[in-house]
């Protein structure tokens, strides 16, 4: 049951905060509609070109799927080392500056700035992290597995008694 006009429009049956149903009379045969102030309508008209930048969600999805997302193992290692190094450097600089200035807030700000900077450098898959692509094995044919399961030796472990 909707309480307190949760449906967004003053319709005939609404409920109060106590949960009791109240009947609201419609005014002179007008349909039940939501009131929108003129400022809201003006704002919606101004924002329409920004919302319609991509004609459909499929076009937007195609654009996003064309961005590279993979990162090789050496790139991941480099990103992790850079991330830790930047945070450690910002923590040391922040601690020293905060100690000299006797302001703990500056220490926190400097460490937060270092964290944001390291995230900007390491989270996106920049080309520096994709220099060593993986070499995949070729696809094997299914015809090589003609052996019966009975031909295989069963490996048994020694008992630990």
From Swiss-Prot:
Membrane-spanning intervals of the chain: 86-106, 108-128
Keywords linked to the UniProt accession: Endoplasmic reticulum, Membrane, Transmembrane, Transmembrane helix
Compartmental location: Endoplasmic reticulum membrane
Annotated membrane topology: Multi-pass membrane protein
Side of membrane Lumenal, spans: 107
Record note on modification: May be phosphorylated.
Family: Belongs to the SPCS1 family.
Protein name: Signal peptidase complex subunit 1
Organism: Mus musculus
